[in-house]
A protein has these predicted regions:
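Short, acidic Gly/Pro/Ser/Thr-rich loop/turn segments
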Residues: 18-20, 98, 134
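Charged phosphate-binding loop/patch that engages nucleotide di/tri-phosphates or the phosphate backbone
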Residues: 127-145
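Short, charged, solvent-exposed linker or helix-capping segments at domain edges/interfaces
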Residues: 24, 100-105, 136-138
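Short acidic/glycine-rich loop or secondary-structure boundary segments that cap or lie
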Residues: 20-23, 63-66, 79
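Aromatic- and Lys/Arg-enriched surface recognition patch
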Residues: 66-125
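Compositionally biased, charged N-terminal/linker segments
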Residues: 1-49, 140, 145
Length: 145
């Protein structure tokens, strides 16, 4: 049985609402995060450990962080990958956040080196502890629900 790691890591995972929305994640609670076909994103997913926390980012129209999930199952083969190259992880809903929009993140020089700003097309990326803390504070300051 795998146990949670001592050092928690933080991640951001993007989804297009037409494919998988935050509302669907909340309703389902735990779901596999499949369909990732980028080698860098897959490399990050292989580093994820049970208990790591993830920001759910809704891309395309909203472009906003919507909530927090945790890794509940580590990397394993993705059943949607016919070539059997890529894998997936399971994520579990933790809580909603007041939205933090990409425009707010880009406007803050603190995030100049944040992968969401520098590598905009990457769908899975690490978040440093300081970035995580700042994003959570930004959410707490926002008045949107």
């Amino acid at each position: 049985m795998k146990t949670s790691n001592l050092k928690k890591n933080y991640w951001l995972m993007k989804s297009e609402p037409e494919t998988w929305s935050w509302e669907q994640q909340k309703k389902k609670k735990t779901e596999h995060w499949d369909g990732v076909r980028n080698y860098q994103a897959a490399k990050y997913m292989k580093q994820m450990k049970i208990g790591d926390q993830c920001l759910f980012y809704s891309s395309v129209k909203e472009k906003a962080i919507k909530g927090i999930m945790r890794i509940s199952k580590e990397y394993y083969p993705d059943h949607t990958d016919k070539k059997k190259i890529f894998g997936m992880v399971d994520v579990t809903y933790i809580k909603d956040l007041k939205e933090v929009y990409l425009s707010e993140i880009k406007a803050d020089p603190f995030f100049d080196d944040f992968p969401l700003v520098k590598q905009a097309r990457l769908s899975v990326m690490p978040v440093s502890l300081k970035q995580w803390q700042k994003l959570i504070k930004m959410s707490e300051k926002n008045e949107r629900v």
